[in-house]
């Protein structure tokens, strides 16, 4: 206690006089006791200068820190539950043990040690280490221990961040050290010609540059969506500033090169403005979005190019003085690019809706290309000299409609978009009809030369889809993208209008014109996500299932090729059934894709990665086939047949796709993208075959055999598929499948009955004894858990006060 009263008078005097110091800038310093780091703030100019003299070695006497404890954490000292009052902090020389202790100990017993408001802390066995610099946003200290760091390292945490300020001019190397906090710090190297990049309030990427003597600049990215790359060779370039909005972005620029390159990261964006000597300042108008507009210099003779941005995220990169107009896009939400050389074109404005999109147009070129990015969309209206203005009607969606000029003699083509995300690209005055689509939800293409056709309207439903129509060509092509769908209705001259009935689903029904008085083909979609493409007046029939895919129809189909996209399934059936025996495919509850090329010597079936499809064929002389379902979700399909009775399908609430072609010898295909579809066929000469389901997702298919007994199917709790073949002279053939993904390929019209499975494991049926082993294992784990809890409770009861036997300290109080 004698030492307590011998606390140096200088401490008391300095503390009591702290209120008279003049406040100016704020500074942050790190104080260490061994490996424990503590950060305190100074707001008095005299104290700040004193601390800096301690760091530089000019002050060697008053080097220890004392300050009043405030029992709550603060953002710049996030590692501890207390901090020092900035106004009370000062420096002293002598050593006293009463208020000296490690930070960790004080942090653990702060409530007992500081019961009053006048609790001081004077850790004399520590040392002042360095000064830290902060920005104006939420952040914390980022510091790492590096003694001889030639490489400047930046370590980021998990939050939005700000710019850290440079250390004083005395220290050319700026070291940054990080705590385990939510923060990122960006710092800059002094003696490099590299142009600075200022980051805003965003999630970023850490850039680490090699030492200044290394000509090659390396970029190290962190774990965020962004990369800031700085390019060298800025020797003669003008000052390049980066103005940031409230965005996420990376802008990389090479300025004094003939080729104007833009390097983007994988991020949202930033606003960049360049000064150009011979041009007016390029303005950037932002709406409610996060974006970036980059304007390139050398606009010497170009007209004023304004970019009006809507509610989107984009990056605009422009190369203006090149013959080839190049656009470099990254992996970002988009950019509106307008090209110069608008010498004779009218004013081209961009009207944006509530979308995210990129529209790039080259206007006075022979070829009218449209480049789209990976985005949702924007509304663009172009002025057309001769036709009337094309109006655009939007639904509840984000979309883009692009209309091309020079519609000299074509009729007005209206697009009514619904609740979709799409991009419509039209190239009208070209002999070759080109469509460029990106990685978007869809693309609606209407071709010109509708001189002899009625008005073609597009009615979209509550779907996402892509409908491409080529009307004045012999080949009826339908190109689909990887999307959900839309309802399309076409007017047919002679037949009545084909109605479309939708369920609760997102779908697309495409109807083609029937030129030759064919009967109307009706499609009743259920609760599915599907795309039905019908080419009616063509020899080739194309049937798709409930998939994400792309069907491309070829013109002079000697060889029947099928182009699949990135889909879950594609069912293709080819015509030319010279020997029209019934081709049946019975898939189970598998993930598959069935493609059929029928008029080839080799019958190939390619399957993909989908759930299943039940296919039942109609037999002329059979009665109606009922369908019994269990716990599944299904759909209703009804088709009218002239020469047959009505085929009813009783479905539940499932997701499926049913495609039917009625007036052909080929039997229909019923597929679903569903947990299951149970289809039962009746044979008038045999009793009805029943279907038994388990708790699984499956499909049981039973075939009637005249000379054999019924083939039984036993399922476990797995996903499986039972395939049964009719063999008159053979015994019953059973297939037991396990929890696999399989493919069943059947070629029926050959002498040899083959069943080929692709990439599956066969006969993985978990048997009864395996279930018993699992149940025994669960019982054993339950007993072990009960024993552990009992022992833990006994230990706690024997040691109730173990955590209270700690030492406390006495802190001096003023």
Curated annotation (Swiss-Prot):
Keywords: Coiled coil, Repeat, Signal. Residues 149-757 are annotated as: 26 X tandem repeats. Residues 1-24 form the signal peptide. Residues 754-787 form a coiled coil. It comes from the Eukaryota. Induction: By cAMP. This is Cyclic AMP-inducible protein BP74.
